Each structure stands twice: as structure tokens, then as C-alpha cells.
Curated annotation (Swiss-Prot):
Protein name: Methylthioribose-1-phosphate isomerase
Entry EC number(s): 5.3.1.23
GO biological process: L-methionine salvage from methylthioadenosine
Subcellular location: Cytoplasm; Nucleus
Reactions that this protein is recorded to catalyse: 5-(methylsulfanyl)-alpha-D-ribose 1-phosphate = 5-(methylsulfanyl)-D-ribulose 1-phosphate
Pathway(s): Amino-acid biosynthesis; L-methionine biosynthesis via salvage pathway; L-methionine from S-methyl-5-thio-alpha-D-ribose 1-phosphate: step 1/6
Amino acid sequence: MATLQAIKYSRGKLLVLDQLRLPHENHYDEVSTAEEAFDCIRSMRVRGAPAIAIVAALAHAVELHNGDCTATEPEEVIAHIEKRLDYLKESRPTAVDLSNAITLLKLATRAANLEGLAHPEAKEAILNTYIQTAEEILAKDLHNNTSIGSYGTAWLQQQYSASSEKPISVLTHCNTGSLATSGHGTALGIIRTLHSEGLLKHAYCTETRPYNQGSRLTSFELVFEGIPSTLITDSMAGALFNLHRERMNIGAVIVGADRVVRNGDTANKIGTYQLAVLARHHGVKFVVAAPTTSIDLETGNGSAIEIEERKREELTQISGAIVNEDGTVDTSKTARVAIADQRIGVWNPAFDVTPHELIDAIVTERGTVVKGADGKFDFSQVLPERLASVAARQL
């Protein structure tokens, strides 16, 4: 089955799908510098925690491959790389994948084997180490997403005895598919796997105001791949559970994550928290799908997560392609219109934090983590080394 690609990469060239033009136009921007990557991420032409990290890492790989670094001394080369990475880190501070990728790239670059090399060869070794590490981040993400899909499907099948005769329906929020990752997706990856195994009855997606990632992107992916699906507004979720849970066998809300902290509190797209509350009230499982790169063991709980706030116009204005009188869409014309009094005060956090108490399972590429008898998530089964390292530093 054909899938969408948000990122197209070959060494020395990076193309990023402009998701602001979807679903009406498929247009790829060439991203050749850290500045272009920063703007691409900040403007949300690319979004989704894994995709953000990949674009940042590969953009700098492209500029290094194409001769951006003029330094010759090994320490100066490393300093140049780290300065560019620190700049890119500020493009989306809530997404921990970006921070983790930058840490990995810095460590790998400093660990490059320079023994017996003169300065020109040492510089080349450092650059090659960076580029190869960035390319490995891309390849690993796709593998991880496929594993998340398998683990999540297995857990849901076990919870509901799902089968082709008794498929389940699910609700998802924001966009967590091929457009938010290197491919397949996290939460949407589980939905894809459920569908491919004949275990999915129906997928519901929220529009995800104010940026409409659900209506613009997730619905586009679901239709593109022929997955039975329905779009609802964010405010319809409670009514959906109340009126259709039994008839449609709605078993789970499946969401992604921009950051999961040590106790399981999860930062994700604004609106996630209220879905968790509704799911708990109606007896629907609430599942977070995230690679281990999105897990932040350094932060104890969600109160310490920095929440990005975005511009007021995202709530008071909206843009899109022109709809003709006969109902056809003219993608060559767009308009931006006001949908609120422009004088109204606006609060526009991009994310909220769902308390771990409302989460039933966190699905990673290494397995599904559930709460123990004490009501707490234990990440030792999927991140034993990182957890031990954090614990040792706290002694």
C-alpha cells in the first residue's frame, strides 16, 4: 500500500513536504541550511516530534556535506556543529525527540575516531560521523514505528479479544502518521496495523483545533490509504462515546506524544487531556504511542514540562483553498479570513499535559508499558540503562 512521505532524503539533499498546503497540494520544499530547517519547523510546515528531530538532524547534515563548515581544527569543527545544533534546538522546545537527537549527535561527533589523523582527515572524519548518525536517526525511526504498530495492535487485541469478526473502533487526535514521522507513524501506525490485520472497524479523528492537524492531515492520510474513517470536531468526542461506543465497539483513544516524563505524564497536542478525561468516564482505554526517544527520564513529572504558546492569529483567523459555488475546490486560490473579533484576548498553548493516572498504556518500539499495582509506570523494561543512569546521578 502506498504511503505518504513527509521527508525525502539523499545525501546532500533534503526535501520536506509543506504540510500547510495539505490536503489540497503536495509541495516539497528543499531544505539546505539550519536556518531553513528552523523556519520549516517553527512555521509548522513540518510537525510531529519524530519528524522535527529528523529534519533538524538531516538539514545540518546537508549543509555539512555541501561545505558549510569552514573550520579546520577538530575542536573548532565540533564547536561549529554544536552551535548549529543548539540553534535548531530552539525551534520547538516542547518536543523531546529534538533534544534527544541533538544530544545523540553531539556525543557521536565528539566520539569520532581521530587517532593518527591530520587536520583535513580529522575534519572529514567528524563530518562523516555526524552525517552517518543523522542518517541512522532517519532509518531507525521507520523501524521503530513499525514495531510500535505491532506492539500496540497486540495489546489492544488482547484487551478486547479483537478479531476480524469482532473488530474495534478507535479515536485519534492530531496527526501521528507518515506526515509526523519518517513513515508509518506512531498512534496512526497502530491504526494502520490494526487495519492491515483486519482488526479495525472504524477510525475517528478529531479536527484538532486550532491548527487542524486532524482535519488537514490525519483525515488526508486515512482517505489516502482507504482506512474507514470519520472526522469529528474536538467537542464531539464525549457525544461519540456516549452514543456510539457500544454499537461501533470503540475500544481506545490512541494518541502520540511530544514528551513522556518519568512518571508517565504526557505532553501532547492541546486537547489530549480532555480526551483522556472523557475516555476514563466512558470506560475507553487511553493509549499513548511514542518511541523511546520521546521519553524524558530526566524530568520527574509533567509540571516541569515547558509548554510552547503560539500566536493569537491561529485562533482568530483561518486560511484555506477557495471553494467554488459548485462545490469544487480551487487550489490555485487561497484566502485568509477572520473568524473572531480581532480585539479579543487569546490564550493559545500548543500542548497540554495528560496525568499518568488517566493513561492505560504507553506503547514504545521496545514493548508496551502498563502501570503496576502501585499505579505507576515502570520504564525499566524498555529503558533499563537510561533509568539506571538517571537513578545513579540522583544518589
